């Protein structure tokens, strides 16, 4: 019953948005624009330690830009990662909880402000707790290869995600966002974990793709979606952090393979070299192009559209303006 009520909140938001809600954009790279140093295994999560107010500021920027869903700064925030920095388990769990609290505080403050303005066009945003892949924790680019090694089993992946999931759920987000999943094994681990923990919060699972056809592991999306399609916990499935030029084909593909809502939030088109820890020169798409893409993606059936790495509040504003134009 609780899961159904929370899923209904998301469904109502999508309806208010005219059939497609706007997810926020690149978080770590926006922190970087404001001077944060993110060349760190913890990536954006390092700001949870060093500058939490900056995290709240970035959430506010995306809300002002028209985001209907804000995603927490916990993508690369893991208990093992924090422990490796010398933090205690209690401190690590507190930082995970803080990632949700900062997003909720920003959402509530923004909504209190705009609610006093007659005729505003904003919706009360939902907060999605980000859960990055095992590869994101490894910080070696393996979320873009899907190859975790023979020693990484289904149970190991569930054990890796379990306590982080528990802490984030206890913090009370509206949604859960499993992001940049590179293979079927980890997707299945996420689904089984939600069921084992009896989680009553709707989730989406996003894969990535390096060729616009398959998961990074080489598995077909038909294979990858099989465990997701059977789960009541999974509200939406889709793609994040893939180049925009892949998205149209992938929406068409997913629409044939699932009855779940489809969520897409690509990067700017630039390519991240996980080993060299740098962005590589490549085709980059601007706000005008994202605005044009968003209409096409919505018309193809996407229910949630946003941006990932190297997209900005300006990008999200362009998407929001286009999708909410009557």
From Swiss-Prot:
Expression (tissue specificity): Expressed predominantly in roots. Expressed in rosette leaves, cauline leaves and developing seeds.
Binding site for Zn(2+): 241, 308-309
Activity modulation comment: Strongly inhibited by methionine.
Keywords of this entry: Amino-acid biosynthesis, Metal-binding, Methionine biosynthesis, Methyltransferase, S-adenosyl-L-methionine, Transferase, Zinc
Record-level Gene Ontology MF annotations: S-adenosylmethionine-homocysteine S-methyltransferase activity; S-methylmethionine-homocysteine S-methyltransferase activity; zinc ion binding
Cofactor(s) the record lists: Zn(2+)
Disulfide bonds: none
Enzyme class: transferase
Domain Hcy-binding: 9-323
Catalytic reactions of this protein: S-methyl-L-methionine + L-homocysteine = 2 L-methionine + H(+)
Pfam families per the UniProt record, alphabetical: S-methyl_trans
PROSITE patterns: HCY
EC numbers, comma separated: 2.1.1.10
The keyword Metal-binding belongs to this UniProt entry's keyword annotation: yes
Gene Ontology BP terms: methionine biosynthetic process; methylation
Described function: Catalyzes methyl transfer from S-methylmethionine (SMM) to adenosyl-L-homocysteine (AdoMet). SMM degradation (by HMT-1, HMT-2 and HMT-3) and biosynthesis (by MMT1) constitute the SMM cycle in plants, which is probably required to achieve short term control of AdoMet level.
Subunit description: Monomer.
Protein name: Homocysteine S-methyltransferase 1
Lineage of source species: Eukaryota, Viridiplantae, Streptophyta, Embryophyta, Tracheophyta
Protein encoded by which gene: HMT-1
